[in-house]
Amino acid sequence: MKSSKYPFNKIANLLLLLFISSICSAEYLDNLSIKKIIDGDTVHVFHQDETYKVRLIEIDAPERNQPYGRDSTNYLKFLLKEGKVDVEISGTDRYGRKLGRLYWKGRDINREMVTAGYAWVYDDYVTDRSFYENQSKARKLKKGLWKDSNSIPPWEWRKRKK
């Protein structure tokens, strides 16, 4: 009986170590200038003589040529019109973009894009399940892309366009 507890403790300790290392690996950069807003989930920011391409985590906004794509981009421009943000970087994607969460005056911009109905929760990559509550409210109130009951998530749109 005792031998069955040992593997569990080992696994639990390993999971705890992985969780702690993931928290510690996040990098927080403050007061960055917005250089360019590419679309509703990608921006270029400037920090210490270097420009970073940042992909907003937890969300997937409509593609530029997709219905609501321009609206999504314009809403992100509206949110970031004052041009300075804080970024919590949690990694790098396969395209070399920094994966991050944007904050403007303490406001979570990634979450705001979902709350306003200009981005979906990115099912395959979401780690903060509370984003689904924001999405449900936006859908119920028919905000942004939820005005169209046939809206297609970007990941499906991209598959269809291949």
Where on the chain are the PLM-derived regions?
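Small beta-barrel nucleic-acid-binding modules, primarily SNase/OB-fold domains
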Residues: 2-18, 22-162
